[in-house]
């Protein structure tokens, strides 16, 4: 049974699990933790200081990614020492890729957080018109965004390719997926579970 069938049956939440990621890095010599958590082009949100990083692999047209967004926002509000790294993994088709490219480009005008939230709260499955409507809600300067897409397009496409390679190397088969410290989480989780994983990572400095 594939992931999309599970999603259609509403069973995905029951399949969320956590497993150590350390063996994955050991088995993939070309994959480093730094490459996953510190990509210079991947958008990030963090306070002035942080000691735990949560990496999210997501697709803007994934319904369970939309459910994860308020959970991650609540975590950031309640824990200023957490950093979120957003790894766009547009696996739901061309519109998802278009949304990801636009969202990543919006960071050059300092509007990624607003645009990211607007895309994930869009009332319908995203298409080109829906992406532009979300940009308007997020107060995106659209001509500037188009310029940034031209200027940084190669960087953005390279980021998406790196993220796809990392996700496949780890063994993810769908979105959302998280890395919290040294734990891989496949599927959506609730806030108490996410807080527990952050606390566990905080107690293991080498895995932050």
Language-model features: locations:
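Solvent-exposed, polar/charged alpha-helical surfaces in well-ordered, non-transmembrane soluble domains
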Residues: 70, 74, 100, 113, ...
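C-terminal cap of thioredoxin/glutaredoxin-like
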Residues: 5, 137-208
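Structural microenvironment flanking redox-active thiols in thiol-disulfide oxidoreductases
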Residues: 78-108, 112-135
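Active-site-proximal beta-strand/loop segments in catalytic clefts of secreted hydrolases
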Residues: 57-58, 87-90, 119-120, 181, ...
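Extracytoplasmic thiol/disulfide redox context detector
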Residues: 2-93, 154-169, 174, 203-208
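Soluble non-cytosolic domains of exported or imported proteins
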Residues: 63-66, 93-97, 106-110, 125, ...
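Short, flexible active-site loop motifs that bind/organize anionic cofactors or intermediates
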Residues: 16, 55, 102-105, 121, ...
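Sec-exported extracytoplasmic/periplasmic mature domains
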Residues: 67, 73, 77, 81, ...
């Amino acid at each position: 049974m594939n992931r999309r069938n599970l999603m259609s049956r509403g069973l995905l939440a029951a399949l969320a699990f956590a497993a150590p990621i350390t063996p994955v890095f050991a088995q993939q010599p070309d994959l480093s933790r730094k490459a996953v958590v510190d990509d210079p082009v991947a958008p990030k949100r963090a306070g002035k200081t942080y000691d735990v990083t949560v990496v999210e692999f997501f697709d803007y047209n994934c319904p369970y990614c939309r459910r994860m967004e308020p959970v991650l926002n609540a975590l950031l509000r309640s824990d200023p020492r957490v950093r979120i790294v957003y790894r766009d993994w547009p696996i739901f088709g061309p519109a998802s890729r278009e949304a990801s490219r636009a969202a990543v480009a919006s960071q050059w005008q300092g509007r990624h957080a607003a645009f990211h939230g607007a895309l994930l709260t869009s009332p319908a499955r995203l298409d080109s018109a829906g992406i532009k409507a979300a940009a308007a809600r997020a107060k995106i300067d659209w001509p500037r965004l188009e310029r940034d897409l031209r200027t940084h397009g190669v960087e953005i496409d390279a980021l998406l390719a790196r993220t796809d390679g990392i996700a496949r190397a780890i063994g993810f088969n769908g979105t959302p997926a998280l890395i919290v410290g040294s734990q891989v989480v496949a599927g959506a989780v609730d806030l108490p579970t996410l807080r527990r994983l952050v606390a566990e990572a905080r107690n293991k400095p080498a895995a932050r």
